[in-house]
Structure formats: structure tokens, C-alpha cells
Amino acid sequence: SQRLAHLPTPEPYRFDYAIPGYFQGRSEGGIRVIGDKKGGGTTKLLAQDSTLLEKLESTVEMPVDLIHVIRDPCDNISTMARRTGTRVSRQVSRYEWLCEEIGRILDSCDNRVFRIHHEEFISSPSQVIENLFTWLGLSVESDHIAACSSIVYEKPHRSRSLSDWEDGDRDSVESMIERWEFLREYQSDESHAREDTG
């Protein structure tokens, strides 16, 4: 639209998770935790083959724990639309499918699940990281937690304002928030339904 025509095309996104002063891709001593971050990619794979979690546990001969990171759906959807160059309405449908599959996966699996809301993590990274380490049975060292916290953004990126939303899109998001328990935290955010786009 004309309102957003001046915005640059998003660059290919890359994130640097290197922790200052710590080993990246190397280890000293026994490995306690192996993890990966794939988000929608993991959901898509599990939607295609629900036995993958069991197969992974059988391969590594260790329990597989799930860390479910949730971001405000409006910001998620806007980012998805900008990265793919598609309309918000298309990504609303995609996001709804992801929620459907995540709900099914969480209902059907026996794995432990640790839930993190993106906004809480950014506002209190040290506390969330400490809680996660404790949940994973890892030692909690203040220097390590401080180093991990140092690479976290200072505030959430409210990317919802960078896309054009139609009334029906916002109504669909509100319906999803009401339906899915893991999105309920965002029910009180009135900007989902009414935001100044002038």
C-alpha cells in the first residue's frame, strides 16, 4: 500500500546466537544438552510424520524435551508476510495451520514441554534462562546467565505495524487467540483489533 511503500524490502534474515566468552560448536567435557531452533520447520516435519519425536529419542537414547516459544501472533504473522512478500491474509491462514498442528502435537506427545513467551523473555531474560536451566537440570551459574542475557534484544519488535491489515485479518487473529490456550496471554492486547495505521 501507499502507506508502507517507503519501507525497504526485508533482508534475508540471519541470527547470531554466539554467547560472548563461551564455546560455539565445541564443548569441554560431556555434552548435557543438544538443541536446535527450527520453529515452523519443526512443526511442518512433525505434521508430516508424528513418529519423529519417538524416532529421535530412539536414535539419541535420551529423552527429548520440547521448548515452545510463543510470540504475539500479530507480530509473527506480519513478519511471515514481509519475509515471503505475501498478503497478511495468506499468512493468517498459514499461522492458523501452524497452531492447529502445534496443538495436535502437544496433545498427543508425552514429552516434557517448557513454554516461553517471547515478550516475557525479552523483558526478563535472566529469569527465564535461569528457569529453563533449572527445568533442564543444568547448573545455574550467574556469569553464564548474564552472558546469555547480553545478546537478547532490549525490547520486542512490534512488526505488526509494518504490514497492511484488513479488518477480517484481525478478527481471525482474535479468534485464534480465544481458541488456543498458548495464545491467551495476548487477549488483553487491544492493538490487535484497533491500531492507528495512519
Task: Please report, for each region that a protein language model flagged, where it lies by residue.
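Basic side chains
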Residues: R32, K37-K38, R71, R115, ...
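PAPS-dependent sulfotransferase catalytic domain
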Residues: K55, V60-D143, E178
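PAPS-dependent sulfotransferases, especially Golgi type II membrane carbohydrate sulfotransferases
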Residues: A81, V88, C99, G103-D107, ...
